[in-house]
Amino acid sequence: MTCPVLDIETWFLQWDKMWGYEDYGSSYLAVTGCGPTCLAMAGYYLTGDTNMTPDRIAKFAQRGGYYEKGYGSSWTLISEGAGKLGLTARELPLVKQKMTDALEAGNPVILAMGKGDFTTSGHYIVLTSWNGEAFTVNDPNSRIRSSQLWTYEQLENQIR
């Protein structure tokens, strides 16, 4: 089974000059803004709402208490905050088939990543397609990692 590539042309980078130097928590969006940036990518893709930008989602996250000092964005920004933005979010079990089913249905999948290829501590990424063998990823912090294909086995032990 292959899934169409979700047309997430709005691949936002957290360090984009348009918002990278906006305050987010104890630092800048460029440094700690992967959560709001991923939610902005998914939200913009799903709704077409041009107000779904990383800086606006970051402000929403801070006002809503979704930023945890010393950590960054709480998972509740995705699991609960998305609903307050008019989106529907649901948590998936760590099962490849569930992820590919979501993509096949046209839904981006936001993953919280632990130490590994994407981060030394914590990071959010967006799965955008499955070609039957590997996923494509929108990494808000890396053009290089976003241009690679990732097998489930490569990602599995890094997903929190």
Where are these regions (language model features)?
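Conserved active-site-adjacent core of cysteine acyl-enzyme catalytic domains
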Residues: 43-44, 48-160
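Active-site-adjacent structural segments surrounding the nucleophilic cysteine of cysteine proteases
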Residues: 1-66
